[in-house]
Amino acid sequence: MSKIRVYELAKELNVSSKDLITLLMDEFGVEVKNHMSTIEDEEAQLIKELLATKPEYIEGSLEDSKSLVDEYEEILQNELNKAKKKRKKNKREDKDDENEELETEVIEIGETITVKELAEKLNKPSNDVIRTLIFSGVMAAINQEIDFATAEKVCESYGVILEKLEVTEELEAVEAEDDDEENLTKRPPIVTVMGHVDHGKTSLLDAIRKAKVTDTEAGGITQHIGAYTININGEEITFLDTPGHEAFTAMRARGAQVTDVVILVVAADDGIMPQTKEAINHCKAAGVPMVVAINKIDKPGANPDRVKQELTEHGLVVEEWGGDTICEEVSAKSNLNIEKLLEMVLLTAEMLELKANKERKAKGTVIEAKLDKGRGSVATLLVQNGTLHVGDAIIVGSTYGRIRAMFDDTGKKIKSAGPSIPVEVLGLSEVPEAGDRFNQVKDEKTARIMADKRKDKEKSDSLMSGNRVSLEDLYSQIKEGKVKELGIIVKADVQGSVQAINQSLEKLSTDDVKVRVIHSGVGAITETDITLATASNAIVIGFNVRPDNNAVAQADKENVEIKTYRIIYDAIEDVKSAMIGMLEPEYKEVILGSAEVRETYKISNVGTIAGCYVLNGKLQRNAETRVIRDGIVIFESNLSSLKRFKDDVKEVNTGYECGLTVEKFNDVKEGDILECFMMEAIKRKEL
């Protein structure tokens, strides 16, 4: 006996499969699991007849407000559909009998999916899927997104079950996983060294790590965040090496978010400086305790008491003065009191009672990330809870992967890392953003699905925000007509540097000149970057990276400027100079001279000629001139002609008489003062 599938019957009756399933189970007692289930042809015929006599069973099939014409059109369409079904009936019945016992194909998607991706999942040509959408009343291009309901209709027509992915709840569960108190054990403190430029942050870390890195770093400024673990008296301390320059405010603030204790370095001879104040404010905002290290106390002119006094002005009262701020006088150069400083750090950490659960799934933060030519995506992760193992699947922001290899801060291969331990990992699909959170998940498939969902959300958010910003900018530029824009493409060796440069450049924007970072990324400057710069009329900035040969050739051909730097401060200063060069000059009024009208003459076809006596300075032909009567400016124009006797002259000096006419002004009267002036352009020297 022949059978028919539920979705086919639903099509014939012009109702949704969901409504028909409810109808079959509730009203007719026919057991069906989903729209791919089959029912006997006899049952289907009975249902058709019953519904033909009682159309009220079809929920929402006909509305009371429908016109008679609409009803006839619908009936006609149903008849046409039935005719098509009859032509293919025999083939379908045979096929149904053969496939009845086969497992129905199921595919999973998120809230939305592009037409191209859906076609790939269905293993059908994109054109077929687009055609199906058109028959469903949806006009969509190959790269256009469609929602779950629309995709479900398409899958239904191909006999495929579509299920919605629900991965958000799982990720939230991972993030919100609570730890039992009995599973918590003591963990090492995570310490960040902060302070003003050249106050000795890197030198202090040198003294702590017994490794000289200062001399190898350009300009004496730490170029990007590294992470190191040291052992003191049997206890471990993890140091985050954050850049100390003012341009790295964002990176320093991010460092404070994963930090337990901050060592605030203040030079004994300099005292509190702008970046020191910045560091203090970041620590207070993050609620991170500080241990003050007064450095360079062995230097001539050192005055630790003055530093302590200045600290008091910023709400940090040292212990010896009755406060609660731990302060240690040290010298990174001579290793003076370094051990004491570390003991104070451990004491502060002990008061915080830092604990973590080693037995749970790992989670933490990306400290740094870069693209290595030989190893691919390399990320420095700081494990903040749980234990990370080689082979674990992780999701990092909108990136995912399985850890192929893991290295400690000395470059040694390790198999696992517990809380507060920084590790360098290989195996991520892309370079993550520095500061991204990472979570261990059950398998790589789950990680990929989560990452894809996050990417889709970021993409839609950026498209929405991008459209809004563009429209607002376009409106304001049209309205003002004066806004200039400097387009920049940023490439750097590590993600942290990219973020720092981007944030510093954004701060340079003013009402007159806007800085727009068109593209930024990690890696060498490529031909693609030059092509983008050409199209966007932008300059290319490289930090610790070089352009490849193709990029250089393309840049020469297209006249694109490539500038490379080793110190970020220099890059920011150069961009600032370029912006200043784009500014309109300021104008200053310079008085050339003034004259009194002694007599007036009216000449036909010429107008009123003023006979004047130059009181001071000089009058110049074509100079801007204002007419002043009784101390009030009544007109501004140019001197259209200037004569001495019958001769045309360019200028007339003090004490001489002359005849002149003011352009478009014939109401000159005796006693009027004519003041000549010019607007002198002054090149702007600052934003």
From Swiss-Prot:
This is Translation initiation factor IF-2. Residues 331-333 are annotated as: G5. One of the essential components for the initiation of protein synthesis. Protects formylmethionyl-tRNA from spontaneous hydrolysis and promotes its binding to the 30S ribosomal subunits. Also involved in the hydrolysis of GTP during the formation of the 70S ribosomal complex. Residues 195-202 are annotated as: G1. The keyword Amino-acid biosynthesis does not apply. It comes from Clostridium botulinum (strain Eklund 17B / Type B). PANTHER family: TR-TYPE G DOMAIN-CONTAINING PROTEIN, TRANSLATION INITIATION FACTOR IF-2-RELATED. One of its GO terms (molecular function) is GTP binding. GTP binds at residues 195-202, 241-245, 295-298. Residues 241-244 are annotated as: G3. Residues 186-355 form the tr-type G domain. One of its GO terms (cellular component) is cytosol. Residues 295-298 are annotated as: G4. InterPro entries: EF-G-like_DII, IF2_II, IF2_N, P-loop_NTPase, Small_GTP-bd, T_Tr_GTP-bd_dom, TF_IF2_bacterial-like, TIF_IF2. Residues 220-224 are annotated as: G2. Belongs to the TRAFAC class translation factor GTPase superfamily. Classic translation factor GTPase family. IF-2 subfamily. The gene is infB. Keywords: Cytoplasm, GTP-binding, Initiation factor, Nucleotide-binding, Protein biosynthesis. HAMAP family: IF_2_B. It is found in: Cytoplasm.
